[in-house]
């Protein structure tokens, strides 16, 4: 029998390993379907496209909201500290938190994982976090893509991207034009740095020592605010909302109010956590 000179595996792409990962995802997904009983059909998992039944969401004048995002250079720290089981929570949070500030209830999520060389243990750990993030935000992971790309990424490097979809009634959409003079600004505490500003964080880390406890704070997962924001919107207690990401308080809050209004924030009322003091 003639030997094959060229193969995908020799070029750096392990299809057999990728198939094992797909089987793992399918197995975990089916368990999630049985637990939640809120999916189109557990037998359709593994198809070319992902299906989701929206008929159970009895929302008047429904509007679909979609968001996509990544985790940025926080990935470099996760790689450095060999901590992969919470970065998936970060990924879901970065997408879902953009949905809920418009009043949308998260419905489903899709992920994209790009790697230089597929490591089954590492990828399963990342996916564990993604499933956890979906659980925390009460949405379903219904699909995704894992791409092994030798030559684009070195063997231990990877990148993540997420895509989320939510639903909101047209009358319940939060936007800056709902804001009126004398409205009160409410702040919901963060869990730490979240997933922005890590190029600066890593630059500081190169020049300064950090304790083990604070090191753990650096990779603490981004908080998911679904329950808090959706509770407030259900009670009609908020007019607009802002997800504080790149640009910080100033840039993001200005996106949530009309041009003819200004904000007055008493920063002395905001408790500064240890990690921000270190920075």
What are these regions (language model features)?
Residues 2-12, 21, 27, 122-137, ...:
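Glycine-/charge-enriched secondary-structure boundary and capping motifs
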Residues 2-100, 138-142, 150-151, 187:
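N-terminal glycine-rich phosphate/pyrophosphate-binding loops that anchor nucleotide-derived ligands
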Residues 4-7, 72-78, 107-114, 206, ...:
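A short small-residue
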Residues 45-46, 51-55, 71-72, 82, ...:
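Glycine-rich anion-binding loops of enzyme active sites
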Residues 57-59, 180, 228:
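Extracellular/periplasmic catalytic domains that process cell-envelope and extracellular macromolecules
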Residues 60, 74-76, 195-198, 252-253:
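Short helix/loop capping segments that flank catalytic or ligand/cofactor-binding pockets
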Residues 91-102, 229, 275-279:
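Structured alpha-helical segments in the cores of large, soluble enzyme domains
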Residues 198-208:
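Short, compositionally biased
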